[in-house]
């Protein structure tokens, strides 16, 4: 992965969050279309992925590909784990996550604040068997070597630990081969994705001895969430799209691809055997 191309890809996302008061980059999950704000949909996707996973005051949680830190903050606030570490490849996002955490910190409980470090998902900067829950949402699509990433997750998970992974996938990879030619371009229009199918993920999980405990194909509620988010932006008028107009149309196209099932959105929960 290239810092330069990923920075270019995510700059419009950063502008969108700043213009519309959002805390994260994920697509969201709409239980009912029009039933909540896009910000609430984004939080709903986090809770949907975690599901019934046990996170408590003795847990160490790692958010790999934490972006600007919104979900890490939400998880910390709801579950109060002993430690939450956000690992992010882009230095600019690490800085933004630090700033957000400092602004939202509970002064009476300074230890509850998540910490953020720069790191590569292919070489996670954590000790073997040191993590209880790994959270990875809408980030693995950017990893050129997902097998190494999943192997790294297996390495750092404690026995009985869990991996919660949500990603955009496809069973029609050949359709997106031309888009991958843009991966090297330092432009907001680069795709910067290496898509897997759900079967690819299942094979990799099996190879690492990770037991699948829950799998949801969430394309429809994710597409509904995007539709609500797009409607919110439209409602504020063209001026509110300044600096990310291209990303607005990208998200609208993504919604259509999810509805047509040319792309999918899959949520996986797995456990490392004891």
Language-model regions, residue ranges each:
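Conserved Class I S-adenosyl-L-methionine
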Residues: 216-274
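N-terminal, positively charged/glycine-rich alpha-helical extensions of SAM-dependent methyltransferases
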Residues: 1-30
């Amino acid at each position: 992965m290239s810092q330069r191309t990923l920075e270019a890809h995510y700059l419009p996302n950063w502008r969108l969050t700043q213009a519309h008061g959002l805390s994260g980059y994920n697509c969201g999950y709409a239980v009912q279309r029009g039933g909540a704000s896009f910000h609430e949909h984004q939080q709903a996707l986090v809770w949907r992925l975690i599901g019934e996973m046990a996170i408590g005051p003795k847990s160490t949680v790692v958010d790999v590909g934490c972006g600007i830190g919104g979900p890490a903050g939400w998880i910390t606030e709801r579950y109060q784990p002993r430690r939450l570490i956000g690992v992010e490849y882009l230095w600019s996002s690490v800085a933004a996550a630090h700033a957000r955490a400092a602004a939202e910190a509970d002064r009476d409980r300074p230890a509850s604040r998540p910490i953020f470090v720069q790191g590569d998902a292919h070489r996670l900067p954590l000790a073997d068997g040191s993590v209880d829950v790994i959270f990875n949402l809408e980030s693995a699509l950017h990893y050129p070597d997902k097998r190494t990433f999943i192997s790294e997750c297996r390495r750092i998970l404690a026995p009985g630990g869990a991996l919660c992974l949500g990603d955009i996938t496809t069973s029609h990879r050949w359709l997106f081969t031309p888009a991958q030619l843009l991966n090297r371009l330092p432009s907001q229009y680069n795709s910067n994705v290496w898509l897997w199918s759900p079967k690819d993920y299942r094979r990799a999980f099996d190879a690492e001895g990770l037991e699948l405990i829950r799998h949801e194909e969430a394309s429809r509620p994710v597409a509904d969430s995007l539709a609500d988010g797009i409607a919110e932006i439209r409602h504020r008028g063209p001026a509110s799209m300044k600096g990310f107009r291209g990303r607005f149309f990208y998200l609208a196209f993504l919604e259509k691809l999810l509805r047509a099932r040319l792309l999918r959105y899959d949520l996986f929960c797995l456990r490392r055997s004891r």
